[in-house]
């Protein structure tokens, strides 16, 4: 039976001007819907932040932990512009969680979320929060939990990048008081922590204080100075060892 016939190949019909006119109102409608959704998202973010702020102050540690996780999700998913807009509120809640008197889970979640926050705001506008975060991050470098130590080293490395001129003197003191921890964890039993520590040491090299040298340097002292500069670029962990043991 020859009922099936081959249909010759024909070019697809091009859209007429009439179909284009129909499409224009559709695009306009979609853009309006998109704009309304963006407004709703902004309002949703504000409302979500209000709820999380209440949960972060709850007497129940589990609820506080969930609040920190929620802040982490907001910091990760919200547009950078919105995160910067509400950074003071978020930082206040996260620092509160960072110093939680009871729950190590709340503290760890706060550290993880702070690493996201600092990445989003690039360290701008931290204000006095910088001191609070640095002091607690230092204590967590020696935590028993591998995951907490890892997150603390990542956070401390970020702080080294964002210290700037305002906090340079303060952070230099903190780094030099942390030399033993930095040196010890280069050989951490957790490879992940050891790697994070190495990256943090590299970020902290500009804040390491060598011993003071007199204005007149002997040939040996000049060689030591050159060696310090070379090690700071190539092997900062060795330089840290030399400084900690007063070899250089």
Curated annotation (Swiss-Prot):
HEAT repeat start and end residues: 128-163
Region (Disordered): 1-23
Disulfide pattern: none
Name of a matching Pfam family: HEAT_MROH2B_C
GO CC annotation, single: nucleolus
Designated name of the protein: Protein maestro
Main location: nucleus
Gene that encodes it: Mro
Organism: Mus musculus (Mouse)
